[in-house]
Amino acid sequence: MSGSTGERSFADIITSIRYWVIHSITIPSLFIAGWLFVSTGLAYDVFGSPRPNEYFTENRQGIPLITGRFDSLEQLDEFSRSF
């Protein structure tokens, strides 16, 4: 036999007007904030990832592949010097 914890049931919560008043404002505003975060380019600045036009610059057009198993550190150093 289980006891009552005194909490409201899930069905009671999602059928209340208070729930929908709060969430009809917060869910769209979170969506809009996320869209603005990505569309303005702020996400690139915050996380430090290159923008789509910065992956391959004029002086670096090759794909950064490591091909050797034993000289991988030299290849990484050579690649990092091209920045």
From Swiss-Prot:
Topology relative to the membrane: Single-pass membrane protein
Cofactor remark: With its partner (PsbF) binds heme. PSII binds additional chlorophylls, carotenoids and specific lipids.
Cofactors required: heme b
Subcellular location: Plastid, Chloroplast thylakoid membrane
GO cellular component: chloroplast thylakoid membrane; photosystem II reaction center
Pfam families in alphabetical order: Cytochrom_B559, Cytochrom_B559a
Gene Ontology BP term (one): photosynthetic electron transport chain
Listed SUPFAM superfamilies: Cytochrome b559 subunits
Family statement drawn from the similarity comment of this UniProt entry: Belongs to the PsbE/PsbF family.
Protein name, per record: Cytochrome b559 subunit alpha
Species this protein is from: Helianthus annuus
Lineage: Eukaryota, Viridiplantae, Streptophyta, Embryophyta, Tracheophyta
